Amino acid sequence: MPEGPEIRRAADNLEAAIKGKPLTDVWFAFAQLKPYESQLTGQLVTRIETRGKALLTHFSNGLTLYSHNQLYGVWRVIDTGEIPQTTRILRVRLQTADKTILLYSASDIEMLTAEQLTTHPFLQRVGPDVLDARLTPEEVKARLLSPRFCNRQFSGLLLDQAFLAGLGNYLRVEILWQVGLTGQHKAKDLNEAQLNALSHALLDIPRLSYTTRGQADENKHHGALFRFKVFHRDGEACERCGGIIEKTTLSSRPFYWCPHCQK
């Protein structure tokens, strides 16, 4: 499943295609959304927001399209009039004069009013987004030390969208390597220096992945993501200590780590 940086970059691409342009045609696959087709035609997409792995497409009439890609959903941008060659099932089409955005295969799609946004179950449950520039390391540290999260092992906590939205497995792996910790640790057992390092890494690593994606610099990884330090590098030497990176399973997900410098 894509993690926060990939979801945000997808939202950027969608915004670049249709933001601020009148919608010339709107189509939904689901019957409960059909009444909104006429309501949205002629409206503008004002912004596309991410909340972890969910997308919120805001329209000029105050409505918001909520979509969660889950495992199989994918958004695509095409030239208006183009007919994509795909076996995926189309769920949403938002068309402007020159560009059209398409959502395939997703099933978690709703139209929400401003009031419903404040009470939506997923949006109520999800924590602050790691790519939200307003979120600070101090606020992350406070969440780590809160009664709700301080006694949970990082192996599970860093996959929990209620803690911080947008984290996922590769980010969990890279963050814990960056701070030299294993997944069995809990925030309540860390010293001040470790807490500060982790609070910064929980924001710095996702933001680095987002900002360097596809750029030709030392953090590039196969043109897709920043260069991984340990993820999918089992059997290779750790660049920090020279130890051999190992692979195991934590919280039912593959976990990569260096036993020599992650304690």
UniProtKB/Swiss-Prot annotation:
- Zinc finger (FPG-type) positions are 229-263
What is the catalytic activity of this protein? 2'-deoxyribonucleotide-(2'-deoxyribose 5'-phosphate)-2'-deoxyribonucleotide-DNA = a 3'-end 2'-deoxyribonucleotide-(2,3-dehydro-2,3-deoxyribose 5'-phosphate)-DNA + a 5'-end 5'-phospho-2'-deoxyribonucleoside-DNA + H(+)
Report what the protein is called.
Endonuclease 8
InterPro entries hit by this protein:
DNA_glyclase/AP_lyase_DNA-bd, DNA_glyclase_Znf_dom_DNA_BS, EcNei-like_N, Endonuclease-VIII, FPG_cat, MutM-like_N-ter, Ribosomal_uS13-like_H2TH, Znf_DNA_glyclase/AP_lyase
The free-text cofactor remark is: Binds 1 zinc ion per subunit.
Which NCBIfam families does the record match to this protein?
PRK10445.1
Provide the cofactor list for this protein.
Zn(2+)
Q: Which UniProt keywords apply?
A: DNA damage, DNA repair, DNA-binding, Glycosidase, Hydrolase, Lyase, Metal-binding, Multifunctional enzyme, Zinc, Zinc-finger
**Gene3D superfamilies, from UniProt?**
1.10.8.50, MutM-like, N-terminal
HAMAP family (alphabetical): Endonuclease_8
What is the E.C. number?
3.2.2.-, 4.2.99.18
Functional summary from the UniProt entry: Involved in base excision repair of DNA damaged by oxidation or by mutagenic agents. Acts as a DNA glycosylase that recognizes and removes damaged bases. Has a preference for oxidized pyrimidines, such as thymine glycol, 5,6-dihydrouracil and 5,6-dihydrothymine. Has AP (apurinic/apyrimidinic) lyase activity and introduces nicks in the DNA strand. Cleaves the DNA backbone by beta-delta elimination to generate a single-strand break at the site of the removed base with both 3'- and 5'-phosphates.
